[in-house]
Amino acid sequence: MTPPCLNCSFFPGQLSPNASTGLLSCNDSEFKEHFDLEDLNLTHEDLRLKYLGPQQVKQFLPICVTYLLIFVVGTLGNGLTCTVILRQKAMHTPTNFYLFSLAVSDLLVLLVGLPLELYEMQHNYPFQLGAGGCYFRILLLETVCLASVLNVTALSVERYVAVVHPLQAKSVMTRTHVRRMLGAIWVFAILFSLPNTSLHGLSPLYVPCRGPVPDSVTCTLVRPQFFYKLVIQTTILLFFCLPMVTISVLYLLIGLRLRRERILLQEEVKGRISAAARQASHRSIQLRDRERRQVTKMLIALVIVFGTCWVPFHADRLMWSMVSHWTDGLRLAFQSVHLASGVFLYLGSAANPVLYNLMSTRFRESFRETLGLGTRCCHRHQPRHDSHSHLRLTTVSTLCDRNSRDVPLAENRDPGCEQETDPPE
């Protein structure tokens, strides 16, 4: 996503974005430090090039190719995820509702944010969508980004409750509860997007002694930078640092709980007299250990993807808000961070379906079925450990829940999957 200053060639501290719209007095003390005698003899095109940079970024072609690849993979993957969850009743589980909301958020980022950013990279100025388009773009992109973070955090909390407090999950983590949570997530994301949106607007380039430059309007920061700095720091704290700490702690507690259960099960097996019972229990423990290893891998993958893809984005915003005097070195560093933030942010939106496909047998088979490719083998003829050994992943652990609409998450456990049958056509 583009930085809060949507034209990354324009940096704060050069000219006042909310100055008077009239001709600027050459004696005005506000502009003495910015005044350049050369500006009096430059054409409007030269002024735009000097202060706003070229209309098209230098790296446009490689960025365009990279973004298009991400767009195709992400749009198809998230679109297929939404289709699978909507069309297959077996996928109507509480956990998958979170995945559906996350996929919708990622789709909006890819369908709205990515094309607009490519357009601005090719045509930085003037901004063509008007004031309404400026506000709508900031609000929409900010909302879907915040909603993505909240969805991942809520999904992690759900997994923690289901694994560590299964009794509470029976009565609390129902589908109705999840629907309400999703509604609250999106409302909350919209409300927290309003402050940043209100700080932006349309502003032309102002040059001392020359006034506003024609065809230089950009959708950028139009309020004092102090307020923007406060909003950005608060947003980073609430929607990155706090979620990352929360998710890491929850996953650590889940891992400790699974390890503790494994030790208890091993001690229980040792205490049994029957060799046959001991052997059967040993096989059961092996299957559960396999599932738990998959759970751990999925949790680690989610944390790494989430953190890696969002660090450049927040570094971009923080740098833009904190730097008051831009040197050539800082400008070059900011442009590099800005390009990286866009690639990683969109890459993160495209990565989730890839994770589902790599780490969930059920999702792979559902994708194949939705695409009309069939499945490699039928569940009811598979060995039991193959049919559900990968189901208790962090984001797809309740996919084995069949034919129930309000079954609590705690009941979507492995033993329940053993009795599963295909839903009626």
Swiss-Prot record:
Cellular compartments annotated? Cell membrane
On whether Disulfide bond is a keyword of this UniProt record, the answer is: yes
Q: Which residues cross the membrane?
A: 60-80, 97-117, 138-158, 182-202, 236-256, 295-315, 332-352
**Quick one: where's region Disordered?**
406-425
Assigned keywords, A-Z:
Cell membrane, Disulfide bond, G-protein coupled receptor, Glycoprotein, Membrane, Receptor, Transducer, Transmembrane, Transmembrane helix
Annotated signal peptide: none
InterPro entries xrefs: GPCR_Rhodpsn, GPCR_Rhodpsn_7TM, NeuromedU_rcpt, NeuromedU_rcpt_1
Q: Which GO terms describe its cellular component?
A: cilium; membrane; plasma membrane
Q: In which tissues is it expressed?
A: Highly expressed in the small intestine and lung. Low expression in the central nervous system.
Glycosylated residues (UniProt): 41
An example GO BP is:
positive regulation of calcium-mediated signaling
Family indicated by similarity: Belongs to the G-protein coupled receptor 1 family.
Stated membrane topology is: Multi-pass membrane protein
Functionally, this protein is described as follows:
Receptor for the neuromedin-U and neuromedin-S neuropeptides.
Q: Lineage of the source organism?
A: Eukaryota, Metazoa, Chordata, Craniata, Vertebrata
User: Which segments does the topology annotation call Cytoplasmic?
Assistant: 81-96, 159-181, 257-294, 353-425
User: What is the scientific name of the source organism?
Assistant: Rattus norvegicus (Rat)
Q: Which cysteines are joined by disulfide bonds?
A: 134-219
Q: What is its main location?
A: membrane
Q: Does the keyword ATP-binding apply?
A: no
Q: Which residues lie on this side of the membrane: Extracellular?
A: 1-59, 118-137, 203-235, 316-331
PROSITE patterns in the record: G_PROTEIN_RECEP_F1_1, G_PROTEIN_RECEP_F1_2
* Name the record gives this protein: Neuromedin-U receptor 1
What Pfam families does this protein map onto? 7tm_1
Q: Any idea which GO molecular function terms this record carries?
A: neuromedin U binding; neuromedin U receptor activity; neuropeptide receptor activity
